Amino acid sequence: MTKDFLLRLTEEHYGAGAFHVYGRLLEEQRLVRGGPLLPMWHCTAALRRAFVEDSVLVLGCTNDSLLAHLLGATPVNPLPPHYHCPNCHRLIFDAHADDGWDLPDLTCPECGAPMAAAGHNLRSRSLIGESVVSLQVPQERFAPVCAWLRDYWAQRDCQTDTEPYSDAEVMGLRLTLPEGVQGIFEVRVLYPTDRLDPLPSDVPPLHTAYRRIKGMGLRLASDAWTGTERDAVERGRMAFEDVLTFREDVYDLLRQHTPPKQRRENGLPWAISEDVRKGKYAAQGMPKLIENYLCKQLRVPAHYIESMKHIRYLPKKGDCVGRMLFEGEK
């Protein structure tokens, strides 16, 4: 994956001079270089084309990658909210929007054509160390998709092995690339939306796209909307948009409370957000060291800390967006 390839990809989708886009691709190249993700994303894009794009739900770090999006491996655009003119490629970022889907209609100031709005502000940080592509498909497509994946890699002289946990509803396919690098495709049977928990009746109206994404987060999460959150919203201590409904909410909260001079990534905010996502503090309790860091050093409001202590699971934001696209709930 050369810089020339990334430049061509940028110009193909966003035109010449889209330096923000090119810079994001360079960052992702640095994070995935030498790993299996790039060939796995090419495979995922081919799989989506072979089985009709809207019958394959892509989850995990793939949704956080602009490179994966431009290759066709995921419909989720991880860039910050922005307008893009499909005619002349004028690109305008909006730092004040919560989500690209909420941007109002805009006519291109250069050529007068209607501009497209996109962008969900997902970070490439999740690509570090990843080697798993997660997919969900309807039950009737599960066996054909698994067979297609084995055949795809066999044609490319790659060894594949089925993981021991595989059964009638999940397949873990470990592949070994010719360079010796390994990755895993995890394919699961997709449960329809009606199998998800319904939204609590006391959740505020979801009148914006961003609120609907937050609502999907609550449906996928466990114990993210309890008395602590309801009380904080009702008393005006925080807006519904600030409720912790996916992993990125926790990370953004910690970064916002970190003094500017200390914001150089040290891994701790991301580690805490992952622990909250997996329900570690709900199961094992929050270590005093972490609680003091949040309370005394970052001065995170108490209601957020209480939320982190009882959340049993948070989805990734990209998975919420992907699920909405899959279900046609944009």
Feature locations, PLM:
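Alpha-helical scaffold/interaction cores of sigma-54-like transcription cofactors
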Residues: 1-330
